[in-house]
């Protein structure tokens, strides 16, 4: 992705929308035709271009990673793009991995390393620092996968934004739409 980014009125609108959904811990829906900047705005909001490689290639850390930890801590947001054939099980596993890894990075930024609590086996205990999950290309998800997202929202109280093409708002999942907090 290009280093150059122009902040447009639509990007500012997305940022305000995402901030509102995150603060209110609600479910938001963002849809529109291809090419209007939904994905680019979401990636920018979540600092995903900086963090994606670190979160994907999980392993030893270096001192330069502190900048990425700080960026992730700013909006406490994880971005997920499901594959075309994503099953509910794969969705659950992917979200668990992304949220856990993002939380660990945020924890590294907000807490002193010697202050992170240990469990009884001596490993670090990680709290959930992620406040918002953005799901791009959400029209790819089955009704069962959408129900899994809604269940996760209910249990973990993590705000959720679904991004997709026009028609996403016409989905038949009434339970999901009853929890909806905003549309952009």
Question: Which residues make up each language-model segment?
Answer:
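Conserved AAA+ ATPase core "coupling" helix
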Residues: 90-93, 174-184
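Post-Walker A helix-loop "phosphate-sensing" segment adjacent to the P-loop in P-loop NTPases
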Residues: 48-65
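Sensor-1/coupling segment of RecA-like P-loop NTPase cores
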Residues: 141, 152-177
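Mid-core helix/loop region of P-loop NTP-binding domains shared across ATPases and GTPases
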Residues: 71-75, 83-148, 152, 159-161
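Switch/connector loops and helix/strand junctions flanking conserved nucleotide-binding motifs
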Residues: 38-39, 88-89, 168-173
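Charged, amphipathic alpha-helical linker segments immediately N-terminal to NTP-binding catalytic cores
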Residues: 1-5
